[in-house]
Amino acid sequence: MSKGHSLQDPYLNTLRKEKVGVSIYLVNGIKLQGTIESFDQFVILLKNTVSQMVYKHAISTVVPVRPIRLPSASESEQGDAEPGNA
């Protein structure tokens, strides 16, 4: 994982795993709502009544419907560690 994704990936992953509803605002002002189904380096799959592939370069802001707690660096390192290597 590159340094540019050190906050983005855990944030999106927490929203995905906890199925938190989000409002995604695009750079052209359009507001999309749903839950994050999946994401990669370039896109987010947003599910509402249908699934939409939203390109990250078109996103201005991601707003969750409730506050979320991101795992601390030590928690995420423990979660990423392989058994026997911790």
Swiss-Prot record:
Q: Which Gene3D superfamilies match?
A: 2.30.30.100
Signal sequence region = none
Could you confirm whether the keyword Endoplasmic reticulum appears in this record?
no
Pfam families per record? Hfq
InterPro entries annotated for this entry? Hfq, LSM_dom_sf, Sm
Query: GO:BP terms for this protein?
Result: regulation of DNA-templated transcription; regulation of RNA stability; regulation of translation, ncRNA-mediated
Has the keyword Membrane been applied to this entry?
no
Q: Which PROSITE patterns match?
A: SM
Report the GO terms under cellular component: cytosol
Single annotated GO MF: RNA binding
Domain spans labelled Sm: 9-68
Question: Superkingdom of the source?
Answer: Bacteria
> Which key words tag this protein in UniProt?
RNA-binding, Stress response
Q: Which PANTHER family would you find in this protein's record?
A: RNA-BINDING PROTEIN HFQ (PTHR34772:SF1)
* Physiological role: RNA chaperone that binds small regulatory RNA (sRNAs) and mRNAs to facilitate mRNA translational regulation in response to envelope stress, environmental stress and changes in metabolite concentrations. Also binds with high specificity to tRNAs.
- Subunit and interaction comment: Homohexamer.
Regarding protein family, the annotation reads: Belongs to the Hfq family.
In terms of NCBIfam families, this protein maps to: Hfq, PRK00395.1
**Name of the protein:** RNA-binding protein Hfq
Query: By which gene is this protein encoded?
Result: hfq
